[in-house]
UniProtKB/Swiss-Prot annotation:
InterPro entries: PSII_PsbY. Belongs to the PsbY family. Its main location: membrane. PSII is composed of 1 copy each of membrane proteins PsbA, PsbB, PsbC, PsbD, PsbE, PsbF, PsbH, PsbI, PsbJ, PsbK, PsbL, PsbM, PsbT, PsbX, PsbY, PsbZ, Psb30/Ycf12, peripheral proteins PsbO, CyanoQ (PsbQ), PsbU, PsbV and a large number of cofactors. It forms dimeric complexes. This protein is only loosely associated with PSII, and is not often found in crystals. Found on the exterior of the PSII dimer, near cytochrome b559 (psbE and psbF). GO terms for biological process: photosynthesis. Residues 24-41 are cytoplasmic. One of its GO terms (cellular component) is plasma membrane-derived thylakoid membrane. Residues 1-4 are lumenal. It comes from Thermosynechococcus vestitus (strain NIES-2133 / IAM M-273 / BP-1). This is Photosystem II reaction center protein Y. It is a single-pass membrane protein. Keywords: Formylation, Membrane, Photosynthesis, Photosystem II, Thylakoid, Transmembrane, Transmembrane helix.
C-alpha cells in the first residue's frame, strides 16, 4: 500500500473514531429506551 493513502485516510479514520466514541453512549441509551418501550407495549 502506498504511504500517501495512509496519510489521507489516517485523519479521516481518527475523526470517525473520535465521533463514534463521543456518540456511542447516547446511542446505546436511546436503543435501550426503545427496547424497553417495545417490551412494555
Amino acid at each position: 500500500m502506498d504511504w500517501r493513502v495512509l496519510v489521507v485516510l489516517l485523519p479521516v479514520l481518527l475523526a470517525a473514531g473520535w465521533a463514534v466514541r463521543n456518540i456511542l453512549p447516547y446511542a446505546v441509551k436511546q436503543v435501550q429506551k426503545l427496547l424497553q418501550k417495545a417490551k412494555a407495549a
